[in-house]
Swiss-Prot record:
Family: Belongs to the heat shock protein 90 family.
Gene Ontology CC terms: cytoplasm
Cited InterPro entries: HATPase_C_sf, Heat_shock_protein_90_CS, HSP90_C, Hsp90_fam, Hsp90_N, Ribosomal_Su5_D2-typ_SF
Alphabetized GO MF terms: ATP binding; ATP hydrolysis activity; ATP-dependent protein folding chaperone; unfolded protein binding
Region (B): 345-556
The name this protein goes by in its record: Chaperone protein HtpG
Keywords from the UniProt entry: ATP-binding, Chaperone, Cytoplasm, Nucleotide-binding, Stress response
Pfam families reported in the protein's UniProt record: HATPase_c_3, HSP90
Cytoplasm in keyword set: yes
Recorded name of the encoding gene: htpG
Disulfide bridge partners, by residue number: none
Function: Molecular chaperone. Has ATPase activity.
Length: 654
C-alpha cells in the first residue's frame, strides 16, 4: 500500500484508562523526568530483540536494514529529540492497540486504586504497570511515532498525540523497517537536547543494552568562512550483555540499573545472584529478587526470567526454567547449549532445560537463605511481599522442602512479629515433641481458640497460620529438624501425659460414657464421635479434625472460591471438657432423666457454640437464638427469685 492510496487520517479516543495513566505519569513523576529515556530505550531494545529472534527463521526480514541498533537524534533548531530503532516495527493495528489501549486485565481497578494513593504515588507500581511509552509526556507536549512493520511491505504509519484524550493515525513514509519516536520537547525541557546530558543518561541507565546506541553529534571544523559543521553517529554505550561480564567489573549501581531496565521497576531489587555454570550444561544466569510484587503477579503475561541463547533473546517468560512458586524471580538465563530455533515443545522435553531449571531453583533458594541470614529486615520485606508464593514450593518441590522450611516466617502465641521455625525449635519446652500450629482466618480469630488451651497451659508456643496456602504448606513440610508439625485442630495433639494424668483421663471418660453416648445419638448427623478432651481447660466443648480431614476454615475457603462443590464435608469430632461446670450440670441432669428435653437442647446448643467458636455458621440461627433466649430467661428467673428465709438457728450460726 502506498501513501497515495492509503486511508486518510483517523482520529481515535484514548481508552479511559490511558487518560488516567497519562495524568498519573505527568503529575506523579515530575521529579524523575529523565527516566523517559530509559523507558523508550528499553522499549526500542525489546523491539530489536524480537526482530532478531524472528530473523532466525525469517532471515529476509533483515534484507532492507541489516543493522540492529538504536539512534538518538537531537535537533536543537526544531526542539525535538528522536529515539529510533531498526527493530520489529508496528503495523497500523498494532499502533492503535499498543499506544491507545492497555491490554492488562484489571487495569481499570489498578489505576483507580493507584490514583487514590494521593501524593504517595507508589512509583514502583506505576513502573511495573508499564508506563514505558507514556513517560515521553514528562518532557514532551507532542509525540509523533512513525513505524514500519518488518515483513509487511513498505507501508508505514504515523501516530500523533498531544495527550489530550485522543490520537491520530495516518499513512507515512519510512525507508526501512523500525520505529522512530519524535518528542517535541516542552520549553523547559530542552536540556535533553544536549550531547553530554544524553551521554550521561545512557551511561547511567542503559549502558548494558545489548545493541549499539548511537548518538548523533555535531562537530565544527575550521574557523571563519571555512568553518564547517558535520554530523555523525557515535556509539555511546558498551553494547555488551551485562550478565556476560565478570562480576568484578560490575558495580552494585550497574546491577540495579540493569534490573530496572529489565523489569521497568522503579525500585532497586532486594538481592541478586550472578553465576556461570560450567560442565555438561553451560549457561550464565543473573537473577533478582524484587522489593515489591507487581500488581499482576499471578497473570499469565507477567514477565519472569528471560531466556537467551548465545546472547540472542528467545522469550520473555520461560516457564520451563522457573517453577510457579518462584514466579517472583526476575532475570536472564543465557544458554550455549540450546538451539537458536528452540520451541516450547523442545523446552518441555529438553534435558538441558531440566538441568538449568534445577540450577535456577538452587541459586534462588540459596539467594533467599543468604538474604535471611545477612539482612533479616530485608528478608521480612521479601516475606511480606512474596511469602505466600514461596510456600507453594512446599507442596511441589520435595527436594527443597528442608531449605524452604527454614525460610518460613509466622506469627505465634509467643510474641508480636514473625518467627522462623528454627527459632521456634530453639525455644521448645522440655518434653515438647512437636511444632504446633493453628490454622485460621487471622491472628485475632485463632489467638483465643479453645483448641490452644492445653498447649498454652503447658507453655507450648503455637504458630498462627493465616494464609490460605498454609495448610498445604504444612502438609508438604510435615516436619522440621526432626520435629513433626501438628495442627492444634487435629484430633491427636501428641501431648505427653503422666501415668496419673492418663488414669484421670480414663476415669473421666468412663464417668461420662453414658452422656457422650447420648450426645453422639443427638448429633449423629453432624459429628463422627463425641469424646472426653485432654486439650480443653476453660471451654466446655470444641470440634477437632479427624485424621485426613480438612479444617473448617479451609472448607469454607474452598466453598467461597467455588472449589468445594465435589468435596465431601468431613464430620468432625466433638470433644467435651469433663471439668467444666456446664458439662458437670448436663451430666447431672442426664443422670436424673436421660429423656429430659433440656438434655437434647443443651447438647445442640453446645454443638452450635463449638461451630461458632471455629468460625463456622450454624444451620438454624433462629433456633439457636431461641435456645439462648430460653437459657437466659431461666438464669434471669433464678436471679430474681427471693433468697430462702433463714431460720433463727441458721442466722445465729452465720
Amino acid at each position: 500500500m502506498t501513501v497515495e492510496n492509503a486511508p486518510q487520517r483517523e482520529t481515535h479516543a484514548f481508552q479511559a484508562e490511558i487518560n488516567q495513566l497519562l495524568s498519573l505519569v505527568i503529575n506523579s513523576l515530575y521529579s524523575h523526568k529523565e527516566i523517559f529515556l530509559r523507558e523508550l530505550v528499553s522499549n526500542a531494545s525489546d523491539a530489536l530483540d524480537k526482530l532478531r529472534f524472528r530473523a532466525i527463521t525469517e532471515p529476509e526480514l533483515l534484507a532492507d536494514e541489516p543493522a540492529l541498533e538504536l539512534r538518538l537524534i537531537p535537533d536543537e533548531a526544531k526542539g525535538t529529540l528522536t529515539i529510533e530503532d531498526t527493530g520489529i516495527g508496528m503495523s497500523h493495528d498494532e499502533l492503535v492497540k499498543n499506544l491507545g489501549t492497555i491490554a492488562h486485565s484489571g487495569s481499570r481497578e489498578f489505576i483507580e486504586a493507584l490514583a487514590q494513593k494521593g501524593q504517595q504515588k507508589d512509583m514502583q507500581l506505576i513502573g511495573q504497570f508499564g508506563v514505558g511509552f507514556y513517560s515521553a509526556y514528562l518532557v514532551a507536549d507532542r509525540v509523533e511515532v512513525v513505524s514500519r512493520a518488518a515483513g509487511q511491505g513498505q507501508s508505514a504509519w504515523r501516530w500523533t498525540s498531544e495527550a489530550k484524550g485522543s490520537f491520530t493515525v495516518e499513512p507515512a513514509e519510512r525507508a526501512a523497517r523500525g520505529t522512530s519516536i519524535t518528542l517535541h520537547l516542552k520549553e523547559d525541557q530542552k536540556e535533553f537536547l544536549g550531547e553530554w546530558r544524553l551521554r550521561s543518561l545512557i551511561t547511567q541507565y542503559s549502558d548494558y543494552v545489548g545493541h549499539p546506541i548511537k548518538l548523533q553529534v555535531s562537530k565544527t571544523t575550521g574557523t571563519g568562512d571555512e568553518a564547517k559543521t558535520e554530523t555523525s553517529l557515535e556509539v555511546v554505550n558498551k553494547a555488551s550483555a551485562l550478565w556476560q561480564r565478570s562480576k568484578s567489573e560490575i558495580t552494585d549501581e550497574q546491577y540495579q540499573e540493569f534490573y530496572k531496565h529489565l523489569t521497568h521497576d522503579w525500585e532497586a531489587p532486594l538481592a541478586w545472584t550472578h553465576f556461570k555454570a560450567d560442565g555438561n550444561t553451560q549457561f550464565t544466569g543473573l537473577l533478582f529478587v524484587p522489593k515489591q510484587p507487581p500488581f499482576d503477579l499471578d497473570a499469565q503475561q507477567q514477565r519472569g526470567v528471560r531466556l537467551f541463547v548465545k546472547r540472542v533473546f528467545i522469550m520473555d517468560r520461560c516457564e520451563e526454567l522457573v517453577p510457579q512458586w518462584l514466579r517472583f524471580v526476575r532475570g536472564v538465563i543465557d544458554s550455549d547449549d540450546l538451539p537458536l530455533n528452540v520451541s516450547r515443545e523442545l523446552l518441555q522435553d529438553s534435558q538441558v532445560v531440566r538441568a538449568i531449571r534445577k540450577h535456577v531453583v538452587k541459586k534462588s533458594v540459596d539467594l533467599l537463605e543468604k538474604l535471611a541470614k545477612d539482612k533479616p529486615d530485608d528478608y521480612l520485606t521479601f516475606w511480606k511481599a512474596f511469602g505466600t508464593v514461596l510456600k507453594e514450593g512446599l507442596a511441589t518441590e520435595a527436594e527443597q522442602k528442608d531449605k524452604l522450611g527454614g525460610l518460613l516466617r509466622y506469627e505465634s502465641s509467643r510474641e508480636e512479629g514473625l518467627t522462623s521455625l528454627a527459632d521456634y525449635v530453639g525455644r521448645m519446652k522440655e518434653g515438647q515433641e512437636a511444632i504446633y500450629y493453628v490454622y485460621g482466618e487471622s491472628r485475632k480469630a485463632v489467638a483465643d481458640s479453645p483448641h490452644l488451651e492445653a498447649l498454652k497451659q503447658r507453655g507450648f508456643e503455637v504458630l498462627y497460620m493465616t494464609d490460605p496456602v498454609d495448610e498445604w504448606a504444612a502438609q508438604g513440610l510435615r516436619e522440621f529438624q526432626g520435629k513433626p508439625l501438628v495442627s492444634a485442630l487435629q484430633a491427636d495433639l501428641k501431648l505427653q501425659s503422666t501415668d496419673e494424668q492418663k488414669k484421670e483421663q480414663e476415669q473421666h471418660a468412663e464417668g461420662l460414657k453414658t452422656l457422650t453416648s447420648k450426645m453422639k445419638d443427638v448429633l449423629q448427623e453432624s459429628v463422627r464421635e463425641v469424646r472426653v478432651s485432654d486439650r480443653l481447660t476453660d471451654s466446655p466443648v470444641c470440634l477437632v479434625v479427624p485424621e485426613g480431614g480438612s479444617p473448617a476454615y479451609l472448607e469454607r475457603l474452598l466453598q467461597q472460591r467455588g472449589r468445594g462443590a465435589g468435596m465431601p464435608r468431613v464430620k468432625r469430632i466433638l470433644e467435651v471438657n469433663p471439668k467444666h461446670p456446664v458439662i458437670e450440670h448436663l451430666k447431672a441432669v442426664h443422670d436424673r432423666d436421660p429423656a429430659a428435653a433440656q438434655v437434647a437442647e443443651w447438647i445442640e446448643l453446645l454443638h452450635d457454640q463449638a461451630l461458632l467458636t471455629e468460625g463456622s455458621t450454624i444451620a438454624d440461627p433462629n433456633r439457636f437464638a431461641r435456645r439462648m433466649t430460653g437459657l437466659l430467661t431461666q438464669v434471669a428467673a433464678l436471679a430474681a427469685a427471693p433468697a430462702p428465709a433463714q431460720t433463727p438457728a441458721s442466722a445465729t450460726a452465720s
